[in-house]
Amino acid sequence: MTFNVEFHPKAAKEAKDMLRMNLELNYDFRQYLEELAEEPYKFPKKKGKLKSCRALYFKVKGNAWRLIFRIIDARDLVEIVAIGPHEDAYSSAVKRL
């Protein structure tokens, strides 16, 4: 089954800003989104306040970044909640849930 992928409005802005920062990431990012749509359950579950979420790890200019998302099975949906450097992504995700 393929899931639809949607962005929280603020996560969409974070994605645009990230891609502006690093244009070479465009192809990789599209691949990440396809992977989320095809196999969202393969990514690790989070704990604590983000226990309903999972995370995809990747690098931007050598720095660790996170794409935090949740799966809404009833709608066959993957909602991207936050994207950013490690700590920023997690704190933003907590505020948006």
Q: What residue spans do the PLM features occupy?
A:
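A short, surface-exposed loop/turn module that caps and links secondary-structure elements
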Residues: 34-61
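Arg/Lys-rich, positively charged N-terminal/basic patches that mediate binding to nucleic acids
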Residues: 1-32
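Residues that form or immediately flank small-molecule/cofactor binding pockets and catalytic motifs
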Residues: 10, 51, 85
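Enriched for short, Lys/Arg-rich terminal
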Residues: 4, 58-66, 70-97
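Short linear functional motifs in flexible/disordered or boundary regions
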Residues: 23, 27, 41, 79-81, ...
